[in-house]
Design a protein with these regions (language model features):
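Flexible, acidic/Gly-rich N-terminal and inter-domain linker regions that tether
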Residues: 1-104
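Conserved Radical SAM active-site core
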Residues: 93-160
């Protein structure tokens, strides 16, 4: 069984070309891109302005690899939230949300695992597994935005 491509990994122009390859009009790329990156859809069946046939075709060709929240901890001291996310392959990554007057900042993982050995961080257990895709890094931000119902305004990327 072949692994499907992650549709979130495509830049806008690449998505247009992919849809043309599938026999679709270029304007569909804008609709899908908006579902993926503005409305934060995790499934093709959420894309209600696309025909059922197109959604089925997309599901045959592509996956949307969402990160799934496994755990959330909130600091009683300052309200900082730490998230543990599960990736499509079972690897786990950590992200941190810090709320400020000027907006929401997140620290996201760029790697599954870590070689640094910091005692306060669960990511270091087991060492470095692999680098994350851009889509997986975006997925952390998107999931946090969905969970808190607010926009993230600043991003810090953790990794070695």
């Amino acid at each position: 069984m072949r692994m499907k491509k992650d549709i979130r990994a495509y830049e806008y122009e690449e998505l247009q070309k992919e849809l043309e390859r599938l026999g679709e009009k270029p304007f569909r790329a804008k609709q899908i891109y908006e579902w993926l990156h503005v409305k934060l859809a995790d499934r093709f069946d959420e894309m209600t302005n696309l025909s059922v046939k197109l959604r089925e075709k997309l599901a045959e060709e592509y996956d949307i690899f969402p990160v799934q929240m496994a755990e959330r901890q909130q600091s009683k001291l300052d309200g900082t939230n730490k998230f543990l996310f599960r990736l499509y392959d079972g690897n786990m990554v950590e992200s941190v949300l810090m709320r400020y007057k000027h907006g929401n900042s997140v620290c996201i993982s760029s790697q599954a695992g870590c070689r640094m050995g910091c005692v306060f961080c669960a990511s270091t257990i087991g060492g470095l597994k692999r680098n994350l895709s851009a889509s997986e890094m975006l997925g952390q931000i998107y999931q946090i935005q969905k969970i808190i119902g607010e926009r993230v305004s600043n991003v810090v990327i953790m990794g070695t």
